Amino acid sequence: MDERDELRLGCETAYIDGSVASNSLYCPQFITNNYKSGKKVLSTIENELLKCDKFQISVAFITMGGITPLLQTLKELEKKNIPGEILTTNYLDFSEPKALKKLNGLSNITLKMYDVKAADEGFHTKGYIFRTGEVYQIIIGSSNMTSTALTSNQEWNTRIISTEHGKMAEEIISEFDRLWNSQHTFGFDDFYENYKEEYNIVKHQRDIAGQEKIVSLEKYNLKPNSMQIAFITNLKKIIDAGENRALLISATGTGKTYASAFAMRELGFKRVLFLVHRGQLARQTKKSYERVFEKSVSMGLVCGGYREYNADYVFATVQTLNRDEHLLQYNKNAFDCIILDEAHHVTADTYQKIMKHFEPKLWLGMTATPDKRDDNIAGKNVYELFNYQIAYEIRLQQAMEDKLLCPFHYFGITDLSIIGDDKADHDFSMLTSDERVKHIIEKSCYYGYSGDKVRGLIFCSSIKETQELSHKFNSIVNPETGKCYRTIALNGDATEQERQSAFERLAMNENEANTDKQPLDYIFSVEILNEGVDIVEVNQVIMLRPTQSPIVFIQQLGRGLRKADGKEYVVILDFIGNYCNNFMIPIALSGDRTYNKDNVRRYVMEGGRIIPGASTVHFDEVSKKRIFESIDKANFNDIKLI
């Protein structure tokens, strides 16, 4: 059957009788976003791009959030020298100059802008044209090149198929060419600088207007969201049933601190102890509670130099309270409720000493990773210590469904082939070689970040590696700023003050720089940033180490998932080497704990279609090959690997 016959049969299926069997490649389709059905506009566009020998796109709006998920595919097309023409507009000054510059930087793409002001007319086209031989696949409908339009919005598009001589293709391509060659259409060099200036003026005006409408959080009577309401309801039931222990399992960034504060307010507990393992976190938690309670209860710290023992609500570090001079300030019934943050550590001796001292009405544990624990008590686990009373559980997948987290764009990128599992000293020079550093910087610049500057965390295999890579980064000019990168290595020997200073510098804006303190671009670390660190501004996470467990992988990915103003998404760059545990990456991302090899393979191929919301998952071809080899070799019955 030739292509014309295939096309006739496809049209019969689409327009006359849906029961007629035909080749889906030649069948017109309705294209929308519904991840539960494995459908995303983005995935369809990606597939067509990878098959075509030429593409043309005409859309009103282009943003970084829209093109970032396509960057890996577009880079592959550049390598194959597949030509592309992209036409956009200055309508409403909405398209982001940063995105336009990124597209224009690809050697195979020609970018033009239609000037609606000069033409004195609107521009609302949303069309994607893909040519393969003599056949055109054309997607027309409602989707611009923006993040939500391509992944999660309610969008209606149709994919039509036509030969190059078909009337539909002829008319659409003719119209594209008319706009492309219009006197009101300008090449990148002719429009970019003027448009960038106009865009920045309009953006500044919008930002000012937005700020005028914002009222500080402290002026609101904060109310719990749906997740927090469900948690409080379940917690009440547990207490009413006579239980005195409960566990909240909540993915990083979903608001478990506020959930606990709302619960304490709802339950009317007069005295509460909140235990954390970092002084910075104690201070942050206290501020969150103050927003919920305002001045209805007194609050104090027992950490660092603070000794505010008699406050109604005490926020303490485990390390401080574990010492007798502080612990013995309290009798066993001093608190109505004791909250244990990062509760997967409660099996450790330091926590157990505190737990044996107190007898509150309620022990409340909170963790994102209950299956990760300190095995200091033989046979005990976190669930058992909280009497298997789970007040609420929300894992990464559900949190994304509920839009509680910042969307992420994950890219599995091939690490240099010289990197293997052996991290002995003789391999250290390879891990920190100039070639690898160049590779990392090239990819981090290409895939970028959301916002005005990079605020990144880089996870390495060893302390020595963090120090050497940070040193090398600091001697290399950042192509975006024209200045050398500003990074530090932060590890276990860093003081509380050093950590706090590093976190503040990473969050700083360029205009806040002074002679005493400069902003940071990256913090290098091994493990100390895995948990208990809330830097909401993080917009890029780079993984330079093998994945040892799905739990640690999600902890490190989670460092970038907190929402923040001006942060539309976070970019996750995972440099994948020849590691035997590569199969853990799709297991971690999918949340699928069936350990079915076919399911894991399928996620590598189709994860981008089924991940909730605006988040996306991409693996380059070599990374896919390495993961598939790892899956084939792995023994999923060996629980130690899981």
Describe each region flagged by the PLM.
Residues 272-281, 432-474:
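Conserved strand-helix element at the start of the C-terminal RecA-like helicase core
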Residues 550-555, 559-589:
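Conserved segment of the helicase C-terminal RecA-like domain
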Residues 1-225, 229, 344:
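PLD/PLD-like phosphodiesterase catalytic module centered on the HKD motif
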Residues 283, 300-301, 306-307, 326, ...:
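Conserved helicase ATPase core of P-loop NTP-dependent helicases/translocases
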Residues 344-408:
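Post-DEXD/H (motif II) to motif III coupling segment of the RecA-like Helicase ATP-binding lobe
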Residues 388-457:
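Conserved interdomain linker/interface between the two RecA-like ATPase lobes of SF2 helicase motors
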Residues 240-264, 278:
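Walker A/P-loop
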Residues 191, 198-224, 235, 439, ...:
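Long, largely alpha-helical accessory region at the distal end of helicase-like NTP-driven motors
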